[in-house]
Curated annotation (Swiss-Prot):
CDD domains: ATP-synt_F1_beta_C, ATP-synt_F1_beta_N, F1-ATPase_beta_CD. The lineage of its organism: Bacteria, Pseudomonadati, Chlorobiota, Chlorobiia, Chlorobiales. GO terms for molecular function: ATP binding; ATP hydrolysis activity; proton-transporting ATP synthase activity, rotational mechanism. This is ATP synthase subunit beta. The gene is atpD. ATP binds at residues 151-158. It comes from the Bacteria. It comes from Chlorobaculum parvum (strain DSM 263 / NCIMB 8327) (Chlorobium vibrioforme subsp. thiosulfatophilum).
Amino acid sequence: MQEGKISQIIGPVVDVDFPEGQLPSILDALTVTRQDGSKLVLETQQHLGEERVRTISMEGTDGLVRGMSVANTGRPIQAPVGAEVLGRMLNVVGEPIDGKGPVPSKKSYPIHRSAPKFDELSTKAEMFETGIKVIDLLEPYSRGGKTGLFGGAGVGKTVLIMELINNIAKEQSGYSVFAGVGERTREGNDLWHEMMESGVIDKTALVFGQMNEPPGARARVALTGLSIAEYFRDEEGRDVLLFIDNIFRFTQAGAEVSALLGRMPSAVGYQPTLGTEMGELQDRIVSTKKGSVTSVQAIYVPADDLTDPAPATAFTHLDATTVLSRQIAELGIYPAVDPLDSTSRILDPNIIGNDHYDTAQAVKQILQRYKDLQDIIAILGMDELSDEDKLVVARARKVQRFLSQPFFVAEAFTGLAGKYVKLEDTIKGFKEIIAGKHDSLPENAFYLVGTIEEAVEKAKKL
């Protein structure tokens, strides 16, 4: 094993000198043994001349000193894979952080792997039911597809991701991998305890590199989670779910690493390699003929600006987008999904059927008409509208409220039992509202209920 010596430490950047001709390859993992016997992992990023490499640390560099010995592992960071990682919480280098002892996995994958070849990819389009009305009706997720949850600060991205994990794990009993990338540690802790209570934890692997970690860990933790998911897809032929919260932090950490390595920044201070890094990650999240990886990625939108380079780069890779809107959250409608801004590639009658497609288009049409009429209502009031338009507004407001739904993971906050709504019940409910079958019911009856039958029951109590 080649050994080198630390020559310079600048925060998370560590320069290491090796004897001439023994430089580690780019992306190879190096290990430093601290005085207390624990190991710190560095990842090789640049070759500076004949004998020096510049590395990024995966943990804080406190306690490191110049002259310390560094060992070259001769391969990239390895993630433990297989059934042994289910029910466990790991960090970026695959070490357990749940206090349950070592992970006895028989196999490990490098976190840097090439994407599957074109001829191995699967191209079939199939809808994936989530039990959340607004998603299933208007922007259906595809099995083996990529979905982005876009939203500014505090509009409910993490709650929505947690609800999806809950619904899918309970209803579809598939394996899930959750990668917590640069988000709040409290949220990771809540997720861990909720999963243990609901029993979902046995089918989930969690990988965390949260806000308090150095940028190297945050820039790599998504890849660790992805390698675990790839094992289940390629070697066990499973349909896996990969949740990443938050993909923006992956880009943000990449920008920090890029600046630390002295690269010239590009637009808005992001790294010049933004598109490449995102592409390398997203190109691995695909479905092959062996199995599928269905991914749901929360994407923070800085200052609610969807044209910012980070969310804009992520947009190009997605099959469906769920855009969370502050205006809708302000109305108290949760999940605060913008039904007119959200899209899906499989919202196509050939894939989802005419009944679903026609209902979705009718819902979008009535909401768009209501949006167009809002200026007139704001200036002249409701009385100036024609009878036909008054009817449109009344039905649109009912549709808008019926798009809300009580969540299982938010029961403690709302005091309402969570609801999983099957697709046929969702379609039936919206068809009836648009056809005018429930014109006599107050709009409040449709707020935070599951099926249309529940709305009718609620109306009797109002």
